Structures are given as structure tokens and as C-alpha cells.
Amino acid sequence: MKVIATLYGLLFLTVVLGDITEGNENDLVENFREELSEADIPLLKKLEAIEDALLEKDFLPYEEEDRNARPKRCAKVRNWCAKNEDCCCPMKCIGAWYNQQSSCQSTFMGMFKKC
């Protein structure tokens, strides 16, 4: 029973202190607005416009990059290749989907190829 009473007491204090904190924040905002001069208002509007522009820029949809345009690298030999074939025998060099990396994929026909 004491545990339940203690929990109710903590819940009550949390609610009361939360309201007090919110009230203090509102008072601080009102005091800040009173301290602003007429000269500060255009500056604040400029700052808000800059902030809105930055937020809008951050959330613009990005164009998906063409993964075929990325350079391909032979992971086993560690050299860059322009073509998929003859990159790392008996492997085939394929481009990765991210970070411009690539990996070597084993091919059966590549085993009989001369490098």
C-alpha cells in the first residue's frame, strides 16, 4: 500500500512540477519579447527566413545517383577498371550500390580466360 501511495505522490509531483516549468518557460518568452526593441524585429525576421530556407534545403528530395556512372574497382587486385570484363580474372568486377566501392563476382567462364 505504501508503494502505491508513493507512486501516486511521485506522479502528482511530476505533473505539478511539469506545469511549473512550462509556466516559467512562458514567462521567459514574454520577458524576452518585452526586451526586444523595434530595431531587432527585422533582424529576427531575416533569421527566421534563413532558418526556413535551410530547413527546406535539408528536406529537398535528392536525385538518385546512377550507379552505372560510378567507377568500378577490382576488389581483389585493388585497381580501377573501366569495363566489367577482364578486371580481375577469374572474377568479374561489379560496381557497388554505395560509397563507390565494388566487389569481384566469380564467373565460371572467367576461369578459362587469359588475363
Curated annotation (Swiss-Prot):
Any GO MF annotation of the entry: sodium channel inhibitor activity
Tissue note: Expressed by the venom gland.
Maturation-removed propeptide residues: 19-73
Cell compartments where the protein resides: Secreted
Segment forming the signal sequence: 1-18
Domain of life: Eukaryota
Disulphide-bonded residues: C74-C88, C81-C93, C87-C104, C89-C115
Record's keyword annotation contains Nucleotide-binding: no
UniProt keyword Signal present: yes
CC terms in the record's Gene Ontology section: extracellular region
Pfam families, A to Z: Atracotoxin
Primary localization class, coarse: secreted
Keywords per UniProt: Cleavage on pair of basic residues, Disulfide bond, Ion channel impairing toxin, Knottin, Neurotoxin, Secreted, Signal, Toxin, Voltage-gated sodium channel impairing toxin
Family indicated by similarity: Belongs to the neurotoxin 06 (delta-actx) family.
Role according to the record: Neurotoxin that slows inactivation of voltage-gated sodium channels (Nav). In vivo, is lethal to both vertebrates and insects.
Domain statement: The presence of a 'disulfide through disulfide knot' structurally defines this protein as a knottin.
Annotated protein name in UniProt: Delta-hexatoxin-Hi1a
